[in-house]
């Protein structure tokens, strides 16, 4: 297969690198301006998708008041009425005509069929040039017909009845959203160019099924609103943004391999201690621990191993009710710039420096006194 060539930018506005398109399906310049239309589609998708992910601030973190809550959905066992994809629905959903191959032929590269009650998409397997597919809010339990879409770049199948994320490997797939399904495990996700994966609002209890050896391009992982109890299995070396809010996480494990992670969301979990962070997480700048069970500021001291940490959220933890909370956190983490969305003032920083220096002097005096006692 010919090497992929860059053609368009990330659809969700969250992947910094350009999407790669197989050379056999590159949009060529011509009278139909197909390349311009595809770029316009990408721009439109950027704008549409912005609201689905956390509202990002200066350092890539969500604005606290804007954080999307994953709704708790009551499952309804329903008898599905077969509703296959028809030629009529197919014609309505196809768009974005582009040149393919040597430029002598044309094919539609975008398909959208949302809220059509679809249970079968077998008809799609003939449309091998599709690159962008949205099948959200249907009744799908099987995505195997998509295995023939080897040019697929972007796939959204939110709000279906999927119980597994397993799919045949697609060589160019870079963005996939499987949010609000019934997925219980995440084995079988092996797309080599996958950069952005959303699995929010499912029933996933463990991340141990993630294939570290094959997801070496993954930059963004969204697992909010699942049933995770631990971070074990998330050892993905290229990961930059990890969203784990609204789970049941009580222990932090396997974080030592996240050397490129810059943003970590752990809001609304069950953490009482902060063991598990390590110095190898040298790029982590933003950490959201809101609404956990952290009762002692001594736990916050364990974050001193994070050399680049600049923004921390501890609201709605018992420790945030302690006297002089902001200053005490700054005493422990002098490089911190923001706490709970608010920048530290100069007077807070000066007071923290004074307290820190005084405590260091007291500790030194105690050590000298202890040494003196031993000598005597």
Please place each PLM-identified region on the residue numbering.
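The feature captures the LRR N-terminal capping module
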Residues: 2-188, 192-229, 237-245, 262-263, ...
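Structured C-terminal portions of repeat-based eukaryotic scaffold domains
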Residues: 237, 253-316, 325, 330
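Short, function-defining helix-loop hinge/capping sites that tune catalysis or transport
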Residues: 146, 167, 209-210, 233, ...
